[in-house]
Swiss-Prot record:
Source lineage: Bacteria, Pseudomonadati, Thermodesulfobacteriota, Desulfuromonadia, Geobacterales
Keywords on record: DNA damage, DNA repair, DNA replication, Ligase, Magnesium, Manganese, Metal-binding, NAD, Zinc
Chain sites annotated for binding NAD(+): 34-38, 83-84, 117, 140, 177, 293, 317
Organism whose genome encodes this protein: Geobacter sulfurreducens (strain ATCC 51573 / DSM 12127 / PCA)
EC code(s) of this entry: 6.5.1.2
Coiled coil (UniProt feature): none
NCBIfam families for the chain: dnlj, PRK07956.1
Entry's Gene Ontology cellular component terms: cytosol
Function: DNA ligase that catalyzes the formation of phosphodiester linkages between 5'-phosphoryl and 3'-hydroxyl groups in double-stranded DNA using NAD as a coenzyme and as the energy source for the reaction. It is essential for DNA replication and repair of damaged DNA.
Protein name (Swiss-Prot/TrEMBL): DNA ligase
HAMAP family hit by this protein: DNA_ligase_A
Binding-site list for Zn(2+): 411, 414, 429, 434
Length: 670
């Protein structure tokens, strides 16, 4: 492909990708699948890699994040980002309307045109577009000076890097709120707790923490979103009203909340507020009130500002979702991954119409940091569907009888050893037979990527547990047809199929068996390395930390986790029972003289032609090694869409980068 053809294709791809970004993030009506989007994105990445001088700061490929910064630069807002005055009652809303009319010299019976907007609970930012190109993004800061977070805001998919208009304004400053959807917030916190990191207290903190990351690659991995709601300085365009401004920027590709609505007078403001109060808990994001603005920009200018807030707007806040109560007890509970979490049993109290009697304390480090004790008077907060949490302790109410709960020495469910992993906040039960972990461990053990017990899914595993037929994974190999026939709507043929699937799993590869055990930090890739290095589960069980660390890609954290797992007598007994039942993991054979013998591959980004596990199997089948990180010893990096730090490192080290098509071509060359 010559350079001109490439340039034309790059321009077409950028236009198409930005169009699909707008349809997906701003208009919520995608036209293509994620896989189709990734295919277009990968093509653009490939062309920009082959023709580096075609790269541009407004390309969709710039959203993946770059090298970390040392610090944030300061940005002075051309027009200050003022805070809003608050209102909490119907009377205060009516007072606001009266003040507006008095200042404008209007009669009391005149109804003002207002705009009502959900008040997003996120991080306020300003986007600066110069001739349609996003050049600067900053936080609100103190309203006058904020921080330059352009590199992070460029990773937010909903923010267009170029406005979708033929004649963009010379300058357009847009204010908006970056937020983290509730579902994404819950996934992020679950992941952080699984990795031993402290959870975020609420979605607002998560959004703010993500945008204020010095490493934009971390920001890029978090599904942040934005709604834009106000202009800053504008040159080369004019708007008569807030409604016109929102319509226009929406046409230009900037996300605008579809719940924003023009209203007339106090009665319609109150109706909108009550509607948002009722809808609050069903929204996919956090809001903490309603913002009311005079629609006309001419009237806004006439009304002007006070020292800290505009006269033409007010924030109507929802009732607080906090309450004061007493911690009657602190109970350790075991999660599905073995993490032991302290949970506060509270004196029942009503918060936002819901009676709350329990609250998460997250982990012992967090509990100790807040100094939460049994008997304490505390402030709790409830946010949407998120489990209530203790915000702070009212230490002035202590009597001296309050007592802390120490980390338990053994698991409260099974009595197994409790381990506090160094450099983690999580406290974990290491017992494979722990009742609180059994369900998830059995589902994982039987899954397709582990022992592949075809047909034995969650529904049947739950029935096995309910009937008391299994207590850990070893019990699967003792099941009989008569026991399966106790299930609801179970026939002879289906029972036989399930038994056959369990029987067939006895001969799975050693790497699958190691992965199926659910050892912390040991995924499929590490399981293959361990199987290749030790050849049997007995050898792995006897391995020392030094022997484990000698394996490429096995670090201290993984080594400690493996040793801790096999030190547990319950885990060793479970394995012995499986072997006694006939489980015989088989050693894997590598192809000698294959196409990739002696070659190391790393796969990164979103692959569209095959999954990452499938690609790794292709490499290993041909005698190669599929690694998880890039080093000087890496021969090839296969890059899919949104490839990040691994692709950057490959380029720095001069490692050859392949597209998926180029990888498949190598595989077929023979």
């Amino acid at each position: 492909m010559d350079k001109q053809t490439a340039a034309d294709r790059v321009a077409a791809l950028r236009t198409e990708l930005e169009r699909h970004n707008r349809l997906y993030y701003a208009e919520d009506r995608p036209e293509i699948t994620d896989a189709e989007y990734d295919l277009l994105f990968r093509e653009l990445v490939d062309l920009e890699t082959r023709f580096p001088d075609l790269a541009a700061p407004d390309s969709p490929t710039q959203r993946v994040g770059g090298a970390p910064l040392d610090k944030f630069e300061q940005v002075t807002h051309r027009i200050p980002m003022l805070s809003l005055e608050n209102a909490f009652t119907d009377v205060e809303i009516a007072d606001f309307d009266d003040r507006v009319k008095r200042f404008l010299g209007l009669h009391g019976d005149v109804e003002i045109d207002y705009v009502c907007e959900p008040k997003m609970d996120g991080l306020a930012v300003e986007l600066v577009y110069e001739r349609g190109i996003l050049t600067v993004g900053s936080t609100r800061g103190d309203g006058v000076v904020g921080e330059n977070v352009t590199h992070n805001l460029k990773t937010v998919r909903g923010i267009p890097l170029r406005l979708r208009c033929e004649q963009p304004p010379e300058l357009l400053e847009v204010r908006g709120e970056v937020y983290l959807p509730l579902a994404a917030f819950q996934r992020l916190n679950a992941q952080r707790e699984e990795e031993g990191e402290p959870p975020f207290a609420n979605p607002r903190n998560a959004a703010a923490g993500s945008i204020r990351q010095l490493d934009s690659r971390i920001t890029a991995r978090r599904p942040l979103a934005i709604f834009c709601y106000a202009p800053g300085e504008v040159r080369g365009a004019s708007f008569a009203a807030q409604t016109e401004f929102l319509d226009r920027i929406g046409e230009w590709g900037l996300p605008v909340n579809p719940l924003i609505r023009p209203v007339k007078g106090v009665a319609e403001i109150l109706a909108y507020y009550r509607e948002m109060t009722e809808r609050r808990d069903s929204l996919p994001y956090e809001i903490d009130g309603v913002v009311v603005k005079v629609d006309s920009f001419a009237l806004q200018r006439e009304l002007g500002e006070k020292s800290r807030s505009p006269r033409w707007a007010v924030a109507v806040k929802f009732p607080p979702r906090q309450a004061v109560t007493v911690v009657e007890d602190i109970v350790p509970s075991v999660g599905r991954t073995g993490v032991i979490t302290p949970t506060a049993n509270l004196r029942p109290v009503e918060v936002s119409g819901v009676t709350v009697s329990r609250a998460t304390l997250h982990n012992w480090e967090e509990m100790e940091r807040k100094d939460i004790r049994i008997g304490d008077t505390v402030v709790i907060e409830r946010a949407g569907d998120v489990i209530p949490a203790v915000v702070k302790v009212l230490t002035e109410k202590r009597s001296g009888s309050e007592r802390p709960l120490p980390i338990p020495a053994v698991c409260p469910e099974c009595g197994s050893e409790v381990v506090k992993i160094p450099d983690e906040v999580a406290v974990r039960c290491m017992g494979l037979s722990c009742p609180a972990q059994i369900r998830e461990s059995i589902i994982h053990f039987a899954s397709r990527d582990a022992m592949d017990m075809e047909g034995l899914g969650e529904k049947y595993i739950e029935q096995l547990l309910r009937l008391g037929l299994v207590k850990n994974v070893a019990d699967l190999y003792t099941l009989t047809k008569d026991q399966f026939m106790q299930f609801d709507r179970m026939g002879d043929k289906l029972a036989e199929n399930l038994l056959n699937a369990i029987e067939a799993s006895k001969q799975r590869e050693l790497s699958r068996f190691i992965f199926a055990l659910g050892i912390r930090h040991v995924g499929e890739h590490t399981a293959k390395l361990l199987a290749g290095a030790f050849g049997s589960i007995e050898n792995l069980e006897r391995a020392t930390e030094e022997e484990l660390l000698s394996i490429r890609e096995v670090g201290p954290q993984v080594a400690r986790s493996i040793i801790t797992f096999f030190r547990n007598e319950g885990n060793r007994e479970t394995i012995r029972r499986m072997f006694k039942a006939g489980v015989r993991p088989t050693a894997e054979e590598k192809k000698v003289g294959g196409r990739f013998t002696g070659k190391t591959f790393v796969f990164t980004g979103a692959l569209t032609r095959f999954s990452r596990p499938e690609a790794q199997k292709m490499v290993e089948k041909e005698g190669g090694h599929a690694a998880g990180s890039v080093s000087k010893k890496t021969d090839y990096v296969v890059a899919g869409a949104e490839a990040g730090s691994k692709l950057d490192k490959a380029r720095q080290l001069g490692v050859r980068v392949l597209t998926e098509d180029e990888f498949l071509a190598m595989l077929e060359e023979g």
